[in-house]
Amino acid sequence: MTNNYQKPNPDDRSDNVEKLQDMVQNTIENIEEAKESMEFATDEEKQRIQEKNARRNESIESFRSEIQDESAARENGYQS
């Protein structure tokens, strides 16, 4: 009988910093695009955009914190 269970993927964190940096850049671009769209938005839409951009800024801070953690882990050889 064959084993139908999949093997778990190895924990490859080697490119996490780069992925997180890309996520920060993409989020910043989304904020800028949203700000540009406010020119044509209603007051209600502007409020939603501002709220969403506030959440995006919180995400950026979290990403940056994670980048610091991952950079430190990389320097320490990813040891737990």
Curated annotation (Swiss-Prot):
Coiled coil: none annotated. Its main location: other. Residues 34-80 are annotated as: Disordered. It is found in: Spore core. Keywords: Sporulation. Induction: Expressed only in the forespore compartment of sporulating cells. The lineage of its organism: Bacteria, Bacillati, Bacillota, Bacilli, Bacillales. Pfam families: Tlp (PF19824). InterPro entries: SASP_thioredoxin-like. One of its GO terms (biological process) is sporulation resulting in formation of a cellular spore. NCBIfam families: SASP_tlp. This is Small, acid-soluble spore protein Tlp. It comes from the Bacteria. It comes from Bacillus velezensis (strain DSM 23117 / BGSC 10A6 / LMG 26770 / FZB42). The keyword Nucleotide-binding does not apply.
